[in-house]
């Protein structure tokens, strides 16, 4: 049974960093194409990166050098430093090739970046 598990939400302040996680079960993350996308409320999906251990990690041009991708055991991560309000979005991990027709998706983490104290 293939499952991609993501935390439901996170709240951060501008200038902070955050590491988003995606823990998988039922397959080896290093043997498949793993992807991250974001969706700003009211907008479409935006591809961020694709990874496979035997290939390079490919980043969207707009975020190349800004976010960092890593893996540890059965979990993939993206770390976003110096967060901005415009980073507020739903972030999804997914397995497969041919964006956006990927076969397996995480449920997404909604990241809120706000200066308002929660």
Swiss-Prot record:
**CC per GO annotation:** extracellular region; immunoglobulin complex
Keyword Disulfide bond found: yes
- Tissues in which the UniProt entry reports expression: Expressed mainly in lymphoid tissues including spleen, epigonal organ and circulating lymphocytes.
Q: What is this protein called?
A: IgW heavy chain V region W26
Q: Which organism is it from?
A: Heterodontus francisci (Horn shark)
Q: Which keywords describe this protein according to UniProt?
A: Adaptive immunity, Disulfide bond, Immunity, Immunoglobulin
In terms of SMART domains, this protein maps to:
IG (SM00409), IGv (SM00406)
Q: Answer yes or no on keyword Disulfide bond.
A: yes
Please give the InterPro entries that the UniProt record associates with this protein.
Ig-like_dom (IPR007110), Ig-like_dom_sf (IPR036179), Ig-like_fold (IPR013783), Ig_sub (IPR003599), Ig_V-set (IPR013106), IgHV (IPR050199)
- List, alphabetically, the PANTHER family matched: IMMUNOGLOBULIN HEAVY CHAIN
Residue span(s) of domain Ig-like: 1-109
Output the superkingdom of the source species: Eukaryota
* Cited PROSITE patterns: IG_LIKE
- Note the SS bond partners: 22-93
Protein's GO biological process:
adaptive immune response
């Amino acid at each position: 049974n293939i499952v991609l598990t993501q935390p439901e939400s996170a709240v951060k302040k501008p200038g902070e960093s955050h590491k988003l996680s995606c823990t998988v079960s039922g397959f080896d993350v290093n043997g498949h194409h793993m992807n991250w996308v974001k969706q700003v409320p009211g907008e479409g999906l935006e591809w961020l990166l694709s990874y496979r251990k035997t290939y390079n990690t490919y980043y969207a041009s707009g975020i190349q050098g800004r976010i960092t991708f890593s893996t540890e055991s059965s979990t993939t991560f993206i770390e976003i430093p110096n967060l901005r309000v415009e980073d507020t979005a739903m972030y999804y991990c997914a397995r497969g090739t041919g964006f956006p027709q990927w076969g397996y998706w995480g449920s997404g983490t909604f990241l809120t970046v706000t200066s308002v104290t929660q």
